[in-house]
C-alpha cells in the first residue's frame, strides 16, 4: 500500500496486526490467566482476522481463548456475566468503533466483575480501564500527509504510512483495585502510567 492511488493516503492503524502483542502484554500482566476472553463485533469484517491471529498467539502461550461476539450495547452485561461463569481470567477488547463509544460501560463492567482488560486505545485507561497498547496517535498524526497536501502535493503521490511508534498505557489505580501487581519489567516499558 505504498501508493494506493486516487485521493487515498493516510496512516494505517494496524489494529489487526498488533492484537497478538496485546495478548502477550496481558499474559505478562496476568500470567495465571489460562482462559482469556476476546470481545469482538461479528459485524466488523476485521473480527475474523483478529480472532484467527489471536487464536494462533493464544496457542503459543498455552492460553485458551473464549470469543464473545457482541454487536449491540444491550448484550454487554450478559457477555460479561458469561465471562465470570466460564472462569475467564482476563479480557481483550477488540478495536471497534462501537466499543469505543461504549467504553465507559465496558470499563465499568470489567471493574464490577474484577476482570483485567486490555484495550486498543489510550482513552480506555484514561477513563479507568487497566491497560492499552496501540499505535501512538500523536506520532501517527505527525506522519499524516495532510500538511503535504496543504502545501500542494497530490494525494496520489503520498504513501499510506505504517505506524512506527506504539504506546503502552497502564492505569495503576485500576491495577491496584484489581489486586494486580504490575511486573517491574512491564512497568519499565510503559509509555504512560496513570496513577
Question: Where do the model's predicted regions map?
Answer:
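Short hydrophobic alpha-helices and adjacent helix-cap/hinge residues
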Residues: 1-195
